[in-house]
């Protein structure tokens, strides 16, 4: 239990720092896009880059290498988190998972419904207000400090994990071009090989990652969004380690005793001590769960490299509000979906399901706090931008949507933080 909460604490702290970094990167991108360097900024991401393997060539603009390539690693990390939560985390128990599941369901259905109601002719953008930027949302809760209890943070993490799963399903099923059967068969063959590794209990991550590269290539060529390769790979990564904890402790103790026995007066280690250290390193490598190890390695890389790069390349928008008026119904649908749909859906679905005795509300979270977190979940930002780039092609439309996303996310942040602060003061006054 202690180990589980330590994993969650590490997750929350990294996400919080990443969220603050993303805020600065986003502001910098907007400043650059509207400065004298604006043309250079926009042209940079359209520069073509190609990779050739024999006669096979993949050539894409730099922005797509980020959105399809680096973001595949991000979705790999997210899917590893989802798998961990489903197997050993907050979502492992059906009773505990039901409340955030219903909340997330409402937080996706209501925003999408609001968007579709306002944009029946442009319904393809319904996925944009469904997203929650986990890093930003958690960062806002961390900034509130002791005003947010641990249970509320865990609820937001569970909500965000299920939300990410919903986003993955939408990307895989809705924002996919015409399928090419030939490459689909290639991808299926490679994925079959990956599962063979899992079946034969292969724990070496390098084998999975090597085949994962080919899986990404073939899925990219099928017409399915290439980030789905990261999702598929994650669910094939084994969770069990090559050495159990008890055996690791016994072996490490034996190696440490050997190291101590072989100590001498010389200032350098002798061969037997080096062998003992290698034995400890061997045990250290084998006791780690492949899934947890890969998630840990990717988390920092994703939080402090992939997402800032994605934000910098995609958040830059010309503050030309004429594009907003041209696309005002789409912008309104996105903004209201995030600002109104998220809190309304999260609160409404959980409240109704609780009254119908379908789920039980956690005792240490109030309904007022659920509404507050509903607004915080309305911070769509990077996930909403990512889906906007898939849903629309016209640059002016995407720019207008970005302005709507920024505005709604900012307002949702302010309202959510104010409500949580009011709730804290009310609790203090009653104490």
From Swiss-Prot:
Keyword Transferase: no
GO terms for cellular component: plasma membrane
A Pfam family reported for this protein in Swiss-Prot or TrEMBL: Na_H_antiport_1
GO terms of molecular function: sodium:proton antiporter activity
The keyword Ion transport is assigned to this record: yes
Keywords: Antiport, Cell inner membrane, Cell membrane, Ion transport, Membrane, Sodium, Sodium transport, Transmembrane, Transmembrane helix, Transport
Annotated TM spans: 17-37, 56-76, 98-118, 123-143, 154-174, 182-202, 209-229, 301-321, 329-349, 373-393, 400-420
GO biological process: regulation of pH
Cross-referenced InterPro entries: Na/H_antiporter_dom_sf (IPR023171), NhaA (IPR004670)
Subcellular location: Cell inner membrane
Membrane topology, record value: Multi-pass membrane protein
Record field: catalytic activity: Na(+)(in) + 2 H(+)(out) = Na(+)(out) + 2 H(+)(in)
Family: Belongs to the NhaA Na(+)/H(+) (TC 2.A.33) antiporter family.
Function: Na(+)/H(+) antiporter that extrudes sodium in exchange for external protons.
Cross-referenced HAMAP family: NhaA
Name this polypeptide is given: Na(+)/H(+) antiporter NhaA 1
Lineage: Bacteria, Pseudomonadati, Campylobacterota, Epsilonproteobacteria, Campylobacterales
Gene that encodes the chain: nhaA1
